[in-house]
């Protein structure tokens, strides 16, 4: 409560959920999003400090708004150089929560210099949580459902595609246009399923009466 929290990519499903939790506990929210439409949506949620995630200048802007202090917590889902910029806005003794799996799988190296400020780095993978600590997972899920029942949390916005339009769904996702989640439905069945493509195998043939180098 009272901590300054930076939510990176706040218009996605995880980001919107994080905003709801942050407002519930009384955190001061700083958020980034990649389009005007997404930033307008965050304003509708009551977020005041909003920055462009497509520009690395957001770090300098956050430091300017906080008088050079930065934030207490970073909730990150971006890969590459954005990680280093997020470290720059983290206060001493701050917490860095890493949600993006891309850097995990690619074994991206993280410089140790920021850690001289006594910061903590947490890699978060819900799959591992369910696998290693199923009892904790069930307890957390029950607590979350109770918050929905109390009206503290609300369902996320989503954009639906029919299963037969799965290609369009992937294109939409690649354009990074979605706010919230993308949902695939089967209301009308799969009517345009593509037949499997047979891959022909051609063998090489060499005339016996020829020479080759």
Predicted regions and their residues:
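4′-phosphopantetheine-dependent carrier domains
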Residues: 1-192, 199-213
